[in-house]
Regions:
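N-terminal targeting sequences that direct proteins away from the cytosol to non-cytosolic compartments
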Residues: 1-62, 69-113, 118-123, 127, ...
Length: 167
């Protein structure tokens, strides 16, 4: 006898492990659907965005983004204050932010709506909606010239109201 022994081991196939991970990932995916206004053009966006749109206006093109993050993603105060900073305004307390927010309801549920305008810098204003869902937060943000806010606000509102979970 040479001392050689044959041993048999049963191991899971790598493909099976990979498929289990893929299936688990698919079960946890979160996808949305919406109704887009006819004049908006979907464009390739930043990798953090779920979707991006060019929103035409008389003063140029607005930039609309939809992003989603797990949890509260910094909360309303941190996000609104970041947006205020982007248009040259000072941060606000949570109490003051609540005074400038509007509560709305759409197909995805209740959300907070914001119209942020710096009267001294009208090149960029922001319309934004924050949907705080059970396990994640959805942000819809439109950066556009302040002179065009009134012209696009109805389409933005209808768009936000149309957002729902896909599937």
């Amino acid at each position: 006898e040479s001392g050689d022994h044959i041993r048999t081991y049963r191991l899971p196939k790598p493909d099976k492990v990979s498929n289990d991970l893929i299936d688990e990932k698919n079960e946890n995916e979160f996808s949305l659907k919406w109704k887009t206004p006819g004049s908006w053009e979907e464009v390739q966006g930043h990798s953090m965005r779920l979707a991006s749109f060019n929103v035409p206006s008389s003063e140029g093109i607005g930039d609309l983004s939809i992003t989603t993050f797990s949890g509260v993603s910094g909360g309303i105060q941190a996000n609104v204050n970041r947006w205020l900073g982007q248009i040259g305004l000072e941060p606000l307390s949570l109490v003051d932010i609540q005074k400038i927010s509007f509560s709305r309801t759409g197909r995805l549920g209740d959300y907070q709506y914001f119209k942020l305008i710096n009267e001294d810098q009208k090149e960029t204003a922001i319309l934004a909606s924050i949907f705080q869902l059970e396990a994640r937060t959805v942000f819809v943000k439109l950066s556009i010239n302040a002179n065009d806010i009134i012209k696009v606000e109805s389409d933005f509102s209808s768009f936000c109201e149309s957002i729902s979970i896909s599937g």
